[in-house]
Swiss-Prot record:
Function of the molecule: Involved in mRNA degradation. Hydrolyzes single-stranded polyribonucleotides processively in the 3' to 5' direction.
Domain of life of the organism encoding this protein: Bacteria
Source organism per UniProt: Salmonella enteritidis PT4 (strain P125109)
Compartment(s): Cytoplasm
HAMAP family listed in its UniProt record: RNase_II (MF_01036)
Protein name per Swiss-Prot or TrEMBL: Exoribonuclease 2
Gene for this chain: rnb
């Protein structure tokens, strides 16, 4: 009787349209209930029974109910699931398998089975890649997933690496393929094998892609020749090896090992500028005046070189600082080091006055045992030999940026536009409260940005610098020449690491076209997007493996009185994040560890400060002593507290 009643249908429709709804993202808690976060200000309570229909991170539409003046959300429609493809640990055995996603806020096991075509017999503790197949808000009874890939077994010492690479869908090994012979590129190569080229790298480096040679001219100016490994002499554009490199975009450097962009035969041997081996190279010759200015007369050319020495950063630095026992093999090598040192000092001086120089931060190196155990974490400060190479590379990349811009009008450029224009007024207002007066328009120019950076560098602490970081834009990869505000340069195009960066290989091909006087097409925009995405994934992978290894390394310090110096890097409502100075580990200090009485404590992300009873006790960039309260291995998080 009521089945096809149009009045009833209309009434239903009316009720549906009058019921308040909200769209937002589900936030789970450890207590079973959750919240629907609509925006920064508004959220609705989701009761535990309703949370069974959704997962943390799902974007949903929910019906809003009001009972006794209390609002709650009932999930109704799934807009975008949080989980699609994920990694996790398998539970159970035989026919009843489930998988717990490897995520700090997802604790529930999801029933699953091996997907068709997956041969592995899954058992308790295995790590796997899974894909969601069912969701309660899609009309299914429950969540369900397919296991699409076996990663490794529970006790594999190398779980951090294999799981992280699988999570980000990154390659686990070097690409297959061999390059049998050099291509005929129609390039005349200058024979520079008699010159005393040297490489300076870490002692363990095998993929050497830059060699340096300096000489003093009669007028006292210095001439620098930068010779770069030449993989495009072996790899034809559009070939199988080229396409594999294009997808990888970069060599992926993880703690303990790397996954190269090119086959190891090329990256570590045929292309690597090994000592006493003749190698093809792409070279740039520049003349540097006493004040560090690079003359306009820049020459790019193809060459053949033979490195005369594989030098290590620490040895060269010790020798220049008159420390240690290491000596160059002969006077020719010693002379090169002295000249390169002079170039470094004059270029560094030029950049201080005319561009920008990054503050030196140490690199942290994990020392690993054969089973992936962390034996030590060593802070490696950037020493004078590192700076020699850095100044030479920046100079060479600046030369390439100019030549590509002037001769072609395009290339693969690293572009950074400083501050987002939308933030200029807020930035000027913030600086004013700290006694720095800047013009909101001027600070958006390269000159204005450099001027401000120099003023910030002259401040007694880095606190103000840390406050304005959020107003900065991100660096991008572009085919269009543009300024790099972060370096303080009008244009910057890298070509000095073609063994490990696909963008540098592209710039090699463009520079070779310039050398030959040939026309060449502008690189496709989708290549820059692929490179940006891969750079993001590689950085996340490096961070994830690092978090895992830091947790392993500091696990036995939890609950002890061992003190660590730690720099405060961020303040949030819930507490502060710190970086341990000696090893680089990131730890979290919950607000209750800062002060027991919550009402007397104000943690302000906006101001980067922690106030107790109205007084600023901690601020970002302060260095404090902490102890490790707890290490949570399942989430790889380190909880610290201020040392008593």
């Amino acid at each position: 009787m009521f089945q096809d009643n149009p009045l009833l249908a209309q009434l239903k429709q009316q009720l549906h349209s009058q019921t308040p709804r909200a769209e937002g993202v589900v936030k789970a808690t450890e207590k079973g209930f959750g919240f629907l976060e609509v925006d920064a200000q508004k959220s609705y309570f989701i009761p535990p029974p309703q949370m069974k229909k959704v997962m943390h991170g799902d974007r949903i539409v929910a019906v809003i109910h009001t009972e006794k003046e209390r609002e709650s959300a009932e999930p109704e429609e799934l807009i975008e699931p949080f989980l699609t493809r994920f990694v996790g640990k398998v539970q159970g055995k035989n026919d009843r398998l489930s998988i717990v996603p490897d995520h700090p806020l997802l604790k529930d096991a999801i029933p699953c089975r091996a997907a068709r075509g997956v041969q592995h017999e899954f058992k308790e503790g295995d790590w796997a890649v899974a894909e969601m197949r069912r969701h309660p808000l899609k009309g299914d009874r429950s969540f369900y997933a397919d296991l699409t890939q076996y990663i490794t077994f529970a006790d594999d010492h190398f779980v951090p690496w294999w799981v992280t690479l699988a999570r980000h869908n990154l390659e686990k090994e070097a690409p297959n393929g061999v390059a049998t012979e050099m291509l005929d590129e129609g390039l005349e190569r200058q024979d520079l094998t008699a010159l005393n080229f040297v490489t300076i790298d870490s002692a363990s480096t095998e993929d050497m892609d830059d060699a340096l040679y300096a000489e003093e001219l009669a007028d006292g100016r210095l001439q620098l020749t930068v010779a770069i490994a030449d993989p495009t002499a072996w790899i034809a554009e559009g070939s199988k090896l080229d396409n594999a490199a294009k997808i990888r975009a970069f060599t992926n450097y993880l703690p303990g090992f790397n996954i190269p962009m090119l086959p190891r035969e090329l990256s570590d041997d045929l292309c690597s500028l090994r000592a006493n081996e003749v190698r093809p190279a792409l070279a740039c010759r520049m003349i540097i005046s006493a004040d560090g200015t690079i003359d306009d007369d820049i020459a790019f050319f193809a060459a053949t070189i033979e490195s005369k020495a594989k030098l290590a950063y620490d040895n060269v630095s010790d020798w220049l600082e008159n420390n240690g026992t290491w000596q160059p093999d002969n006077e020719g090598i010693a002379h090169q080091i002295r000249l390169l040192h002079r170039i470094c000092l004059s270029r560094s001086e030029w950049r201080h006055h005319h561009a920008l120089v990054f503050k030196d931060r140490p690199d942290y190196r994990f020392v690993l045992g054969e089973k992936g155990e962390v034996l030590d974490i060593v802070a490696e400060p950037r020493r004078i030999a590192n700076r020699i190479v850095e100044e030479s590379m920046i100079a060479a990349n600046l030369c390439a940026a100019r030549v590509l811009r002037d001769k072609l009008g395009f290339g693969i450029y690293n572009v950074h536009t400083g501050f987002d224009p939308a933030n200029a007024d807020a930035l000027a207002a913030l600086l004013k409260t700290h006694g720095l007066h800047v013009d909101a328009e001027e600070v958006l120019t390269l000159e204005g940005f450099c001027k401000l950076r120099r003023e910030l560098d002259a401040q007694p602490s880095g606190f103000l610098d840390s406050r304005i970081r959020r107003f900065q834009s991100f660096a991008e990869i572009s085919t269009e020449p543009g300024p790099h505000f972060g370096l303080g340069l009008e244009a910057y195009a890298t070509w000095t690491s073609p063994i490990r960066k696909y963008g540098d290989m592209i710039n090699h091909r463009l520079l070779k076209a310039v050398i030959k006087g040939e026309a060449i097409a502008r690189p496709q925009e989708d290549i820059t997007q692929q490179m940006a995405e891969r750079r993001r994934l590689n950085r996340m992978a490096e961070r994830d493996v690092g978090d895992w290894l830091y947790a392993r390394f500091l696990n036995d310090k939890a609950g002890t009185n061992t003190r660590f110096a730690a720099e405060i890097i961020d303040v949030s409502r819930g507490g502060m994040r710190v970086r341990l100075v000696d090893n680089g580990a990131i730890a979290f200090i919950p607000a209750p560890f800062l002060h027991a009485v919550r009402d007397e404590l104000v943690c302000s992300q906006e101001n980067g400060t922690v106030q107790i009873k109205g007084e600023t006790v901690y601020k970002v960039t302060d260095v404090i002593d902490v102890t490790i309260a707890e290490v949570r291995m399942e989430t790889r998080s380190i909880i610290a507290r201020p040392a008593a």
